[in-house]
Amino acid sequence: MKLKIKKGATVQVITGSDKGKKGTVIAVDANAMKIQVQGVKVQTHYDKKDGLLKKEGFIDYSNVKLVEAASKEKKTSKKATKSKSA
């Protein structure tokens, strides 16, 4: 299924323990309908080499709302810019 929320978009959590928090989307798993948001659902993992690591966990797509979509910069060719200025 195609999701409207893309990597780099700003979202707000609407349910759960992190309700009200805003952050940018780090990763999207469209098959599982899960997204990873910076600063939301931070989990602690233990690694023998590095010790305790804090990492964001995935949350369900339905638990967030889109605040600001990821912006795509339009790529213009050199021909298009020359013709506009002439």
From Swiss-Prot:
GO CC list: ribonucleoprotein complex; ribosome
InterPro entries: KOW, Rib_uL2_dom2, Ribosomal_uL24, Ribosomal_uL24_KOW, Translation_prot_SH3-like_sf
Disulfide bond positions: none
Keyword Hydrolase assigned: no
Keyword Transmembrane: no
Transmembrane segments: none
Record GO terms (molecular function): rRNA binding; structural constituent of ribosome
Function as written in the Swiss-Prot or TrEMBL entry: One of two assembly initiator proteins, it binds directly to the 5'-end of the 23S rRNA, where it nucleates assembly of the 50S subunit. One of the proteins that surrounds the polypeptide exit tunnel on the outside of the subunit.
Stated name of the protein: Large ribosomal subunit protein uL24
Organism: Bdellovibrio bacteriovorus (strain ATCC 15356 / DSM 50701 / NCIMB 9529 / HD100)
Lineage: Bacteria, Pseudomonadati, Bdellovibrionota, Bdellovibrionia, Bdellovibrionales
Gene that encodes the chain: rplX
